[in-house]
Amino acid sequence: LLRGNDAARILINGKPSRLVGINSSFIKELPADAIEKVEVITSPSARYEAEGSGGIINIILRKSKKLGLNGSLSANIGEPKSSSISSNINYRNGKINFFNSSSLYDRIRPGSSSGITEYFNGSEPSTFFSEDRIRERVSNGYFINNGFEWYIDDNTSLLGSFFYNNYGSDNLESNTIRELDSNSNILNTITQNDFEDDIDNNREYNLNFEKKLDDKGELITIDLQYENSKEWENSLIDENGVASESVDENIQSESFFIRSDYVLPIGENRQFEAGIRIESEDDITDYKVFDNVGNILVEDLDQSNIFQYKERISAAYTQYGVKVEDKYSFLLGLRVENTLKNVNQLTIQDYTEINDTGLFPTFNFGLEITEEETLTFGYNRRIRRPWSRFVNPFPTKISPILIWQGNPYLDPTYSNNIDFGYIKRYKSSFTINTSAYFQKSTNSINTIIEETGEYAEINGVNVPIVVRTPINLSTNERFGFELNLSYRKGRNWNINTNFNLFQNKVEGTYNDIVYDNENVSWSFRLNNKLTLPGKIDWQTRMNIRGPNETAVSKSDGDFSIDLAFSKELFKEKATLTLNIKDLLDQRGWRNETFNENFYNDYEFRWGQRSA
């Protein structure tokens, strides 16, 4: 979340990547020493793609440029089982630099969840069901990032890289479903086990060309990227020891990206920029369901489907910046993006095409009051496009009584964003960075829950089946205040805090149900690094998230603390580190969902304390 908004766009080396989209575990498995820096951009200029109404998070992967042969090696071991080894190597001789980052990991991630659902039966007594899930994800994999930089001359360079990621996991989830009476006495029990195998691999090829046209900063760059990904997942579900269902899901993805930017300084205080960008994506999902018929798993053609999703984004931008009296700075830009989508259900020959064009103006202003004090203002228009899972209309069974179904007619969400910022730096190494922001979004995408009118029989009891589906429900207004404080005392103490307070207002109606709601929430982060006697570094990370509420749900807040101790050895050529994640063993999430037909109370644990 960025400022309480889950619509931030994550980039790898300034470009979109399937590594983030398909295999969300990639970010979690990426070792810290493979990352050079992380850029957070809350008011992007027209140079950046318009995707991401919550801003941009850009992860820059490390590539050392030191002369000669250089390298580092890192090994980790932890409990619950967690082991990894990673390396960073580069060799530079004259005009050519070769670099490599690699990592190999093997770990277990336990988790659990529990919930109770009450179904209202009019004048009849309510029906109660509880669910208790225990899961264990055993994952292993590796990634390799190889590349080169060729400095052809003082003004020309060529960078090429190849990234390969291989991920596999074996997941076991045990779900105990109990029918209860109004006094919570158990009437019936059924146990479901879900055995899931998951294999993902991704190949990414990158090429970057940069040419300085003069010594005043005139520059042209060209970026090319090609990716192909494959994901295979098999899930076998048994009930009370008897196989009841099997699901095979194969996803093949291919994407291509090209971008070119031109920068032209005009005098000492003006600059003109322009660029183009084309991005394409082609995903095919083969989803097959097998049911137990006479103790034989037979494909259910009514629940199986082949789904194709194609997307092409064509964009162009221009922006002009000027600095006046070394005090005022202005950056004005305009970006246009055309999106062409094809949503195809190949099994039933159902095709949908969506063509959308949007204009995205940006304006950024800066006032340098003194060398230590700055005021900023930013405006931008952004877009959030629904991704492939949200537009796939074919139902996917989550549990016997819960279905997910996408919506092929979803429109993108457009947002207008305003940001006021103030930065004050003190000579005592104390910095205040604060901002007030406002965002208004139209056609906001929300997930609703409805009854399908169908029932599932569980231990002889007919239980209503509900479906979760995304719709363009509402207009959303978000107003917030953010305060960042940082203090550095030499090399021995460094502390950073972030406090975010925001109000969210939603207005929307669907099927005569009013979803209007106003909610105030907040978050707090602290990162404190202190050098103890013996040159032992002690780092504390604290995260607090306030409660949240919508018209049909409530979620509790979350609190966690991570600790780390490190000591440099062998004349600072090696480092020994101890990490403790979730010190109090309470990181999790609790949510209540309610409507006229049922009430659900659900609690989820992300994992457990680890070291």
In which residue ranges do the predicted regions lie?
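Outer-membrane beta-barrel signature, preferentially recognizing the C-terminal barrel domain
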Residues: 305-312, 354, 383-433, 440, ...
